[in-house]
Amino acid sequence: EWVPSNFTRLGGFFNGLLEKKKIVYAEIVFDSAFYYDVSGIYPEATAFALTGEHTKYLTALLNSQLLTFIFRAFYAGGDLRGDTFRYKKVFLQNLPVVRPNGVVALALEALVDHIQTAKLKDQKLQSTYFEQLIDGLVYEFYFPDEIKTAGKEILPHLGELKPITDDMSEAEKLAVIQREFDRLYDP
């Protein structure tokens, strides 16, 4: 019999995990690809999940160029075959994650929603731009003095991003994304 005898008992250990708010990621990747999930997706292939507090904020940080660079340079142990690298839990735990600051965290969380909705609707220009904003905000959050001295602050110019909510229709979500993109991309 190929099914382990303790399968039901082990299944109880994971009971409810996939229905929680979580970050889903693959272990071997070409680039960071952390997905914030609230819909209870069940991955069809090997994937890992992070749960806990501030998962949406953490999604933004983990997908940023800065933390991806730090992970690849100091924790990934070099590239695997084909330019891929491995996100191992033991090394992810060592990343220098800064505790969320209220204003920055809200902006990053709103941008995660904007990016994920834009990607689902194939809005590549908007999602790429919002990803660049996250990268800039993460640099600003980790290196505030250097960014301020260089006169490259983003947060003071960002304003309050209109949130995307579950009760919005798809058309309303896309309209919010387009308005925010238009407002920020070419002010």
Can you say where each PLM-predicted feature lies in the sequence?
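Polybasic, glycine- and aromatic-enriched phosphate-binding surface used to engage nucleic acids
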Residues: 1-106
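Non-catalytic DNA-recognition/assembly elements of restriction-modification systems
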Residues: 98-187
